[in-house]
Design a protein with these regions (language model features):
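Short, structured loop/turn "capping" segments at alpha-beta junctions
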Residues: 97-101
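Gly/Thr-rich phosphate-binding beta-strand-loop-beta motif of the actin/hexokinase/Hsp70
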Residues: 39-69, 87
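Nucleotide/phosphate-binding catalytic cleft detector across ATP-hydrolyzing
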Residues: 1-48, 69-81, 102-199
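Metal-dependent phosphodiester-processing active-site neighborhood
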Residues: 64-95
Length: 199
């Protein structure tokens, strides 16, 4: 009810233009849900894990027959900032170098040829360690990444592209590294809801 503002108009300014709207209906969805629905290959899976890797946390849920299972929602404090901080600390300890998060991320994306080779080695080792720790934490939270597909999205999804594969037997990853995918998914959901409303 509070999101609809009791039917009262809401005024705001966006990009220099004034707007007055009335909110008639609100739909709420868990983080990452809309992005997962953009993947046609997942729609026939009975159960799918969705892991949204953000800066501070990794938000988890399981979709059962495309529907979010609220009982499986978890938030792990294993976001990319923790990963980058740990990598930075290991480089400082091992090599005496103080690398920035931007430098480390550049190596993780595979486009940092100018970085010290020993530092790269530590970055890759720590990224591998982080990936295994993350997959283990997901399993400990009751979601078996070996038994069902795991969709990874958010800022940290790119990291898993290089460090988790179905071949290693740790999980069945589907990496969604398009930062606009949630918006695209919400657009599809809105279109479907509008079509149902018109019928």
């Amino acid at each position: 009810v509070y999101l609809c503002r009791d039917g009262k108009p809401v005024s705001f300014r966006f990009e220099g233009q004034d707007y007055v709207i009335t909110i008639s209906k609100v739909s709420l969805y868990p983080q990452g849900y809309a992005a997962a629905l953009t993947q046609g290959s997942l729609l026939d899976e009975p159960s799918v894990i969705v892991a949204d890797i953000g800066g501070w946390t990794v938000d988890l849920m399981r979709l059962d027959n495309r529907i979010p299972n609220a009982a499986t929602c978890r938030s792990l404090e294993l976001g990319m900032i923790r990963c980058l901080d740990e990598i930075s600390e290991q480089i400082r300890r091992g090599l005496g170098l103080s690398m920035t998060a931007a430098q480390i991320e550049s190596v993780l994306r595979g486009d940092a040829s100018h970085v010290n080779e020993d530092a790269k080695k530590i970055i890759y080792q720590e990224a591998e360690r982080y990936t295994k720790r993350l997959l283990s934490a997901i399993a400990e939270s009751g979601l078996d990444v070996r038994a069902m597909p795991a969709v990874f999205l958010g800022g940290g999804a790119t990291l898993l592209k290089h460090h988790a594969s179905a071949a290693d037997g740790l999980c069945r990853p589907i990496i969604l590294d398009d930062v606009c995918l949630n918006a695209k998914g919400y657009e599809r959901l809105t279109e479907r809801m509008s079509q149902k409303h018109e019928q």
